[in-house]
Design a protein with these regions (language model features):
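ATP-binding pocket architecture of kinase catalytic cores
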Residues: 1-109, 113
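Intrinsically disordered, low-complexity regulatory regions enriched in Ser/Pro/Gly/Thr
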Residues: 22, 38-39, 149-151, 161, ...
Length: 188
């Protein structure tokens, strides 16, 4: 069971979408709301447990190299996800059109956004010259960011937290699953 202050209905929906597409994820058994629960734990997801060990903890258990089958299986899953198209409008948001969760933005919640311009404006707005060695470096970075924001990108479904600790590999070297879909959604 997952029951944290970050657990959401959107995460359960993301997992169900991935499972329906053949991507190995824990199977959602049920999802529930707990509006009066302590510590802001308002949602829980009851799910199956996947076998394997995370890539982050695999150094002693697996020989990680390009010969392992998990790497090709990982590529297939990612390519498959990249083929999905957003339903209806090209909203940047969760699978159900609500806000996205990301540990990479202040407050950890953002959107949904009606277009890419709105999305990029939100991402760049907290930028501050204080984080750079000089004002010139800050200005140069803003110009570069603005150029990137002018490009039009396809809206694709993305896991949102694709790190080694969220990828499981079995003892046989095969991909056994992806965890933590709380940041998943439609992104440029």
């Amino acid at each position: 069971m997952k029951w944290t202050d970050r657990t959401s209905i959107e995460e359960a929906v993301s997992m169900q979408m991935a499972e329906a597409a053949g991507i190995p994820v824990p199977k959602v058994i049920s999802c529930g709301e707990h509006p009066t629960a302590p510590f802001n734990r308002k949602i829980s997801i009851l799910m199956t447990r996947l076998p394997g060990v995370s890539l982050e903890n695999s150094n002693d258990l697996l020989q990680i190299d390009e010969e392992e089958p998990w790497l090709e299986e990982l590529k297939i899953c990612i390519c498959s996800m990249r083929l999905w198209r957003p339903p209806g409008q090209k909203i940047i948001g969760s699978p159900i059109g609500t806000s996205l969760r990301s540990s990479r933005v202040p407050g950890h919640i953002m959107g949904p956004f009606m277009d890419q311009k709105e999305f990029y404006k939100y991402l760049i707005s907290p930028a501050s010259a204080h984080a750079f060695e000089s004002t010139a470096e800050y200005e140069k970075t803003l110009v570069r960011a603005d150029k990137l924001c002018q490009r039009d990108y396809r809206i694709l479904f993305t896991h949102g937290d694709f790190k080694a600790h969220n990828i499981l590999v079995g003892d046989d070297g095969h991909l056994s699953g992806f965890l933590d879909w709380e940041s998943a959604g439609w992104y440029p």
